[in-house]
């Protein structure tokens, strides 16, 4: 009888655990991801592929937390729970979030190419093609009229090439005013009419049509660059992409025989910006045996990448050198000063402070 009772209890616990695995929660769980050699992802035509060391791109594993994962996340080192609204835009689905992350990844690649080629003094051209619609907002004028992937090229006859251009044209409009939008959809040019609405003060208070926009552009370089990172999303690989591109463009091996990991958004001007999940990325790099880790420097109130990276490196007893940087130029300068030997320094190494513009704190697309 006792054995049967224990068997029934065990079966009930098993069923409860299985059910808990499928019960959703309003949280995402973040875990240390991978530290991937950037050489596997980047190819500069005719570039110098000889590297005695490696540049490593670090990632964070992000998944929707079930009830069971929620319970165990607190016990697993490196795991953290993030409320759904911290990652997703209002009304944004998980699929739309992944699409946004892919767009930010593309932007990071393009910025990395531009910044690296400009630093090396090599030819690079940027062609601005218009404003792509990532998605339409529920209950707004664009819903059911515009579609994800549409490319807006004019508004009331004004050429539109970038998101700031679209915003400037809209600033001269009034709530309720009807506007004519010229766009491309699957190879066909279309004209649509929409009425403008005013966003709430918390959303900027401007008038708009209810889309999440991104500037669409094409980059042309000589030599050509191919980046294949379809399985990775987000904007934070910009710095490491640029370092690898630069390493292949020039004859000097910037790796210095070291495993060099890092993270950071990168503007086309070469400015490094803040990112998310830095603790998990430091742990992923340490697990891969990296010698040093480039991290966005903390400059403005609210910046925390440098502080968190240094703290987690101490906490896990990492021998990696944490190197905060403000720009691609500063990161390259740091590497050029290194000798070709294993890093032998403590966790923290702060280069000279350089001025730079405000970094991108969080990759969240504004609505128009």
Give the ranges of each region predicted by the language model.
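Hydrophobic membrane-insertion alpha-helices, especially the h-region
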Residues: 7-24
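PDZ-domain C-terminal substructure recognizer with occasional recognition of PDZ-binding tails
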Residues: 120, 167-211, 313-330, 334-337, ...
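Glycine- and Gly-Pro-enriched alpha-helical subdomains that act as flexible
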Residues: 248, 269-300
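Conserved PDZ fold ligand-binding element
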Residues: 142-165, 281-282, 289-298
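Catalytic-site beta-strand/loop segments enriched in glycine and acidic/polar residues
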Residues: 253-276
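Terminal peptide-recognition signature
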Residues: 117, 142, 149-152, 181, ...
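PDZ/PDZ-like peptide-tail recognition elements
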Residues: 34-49, 55-64, 84-137, 199-221, ...
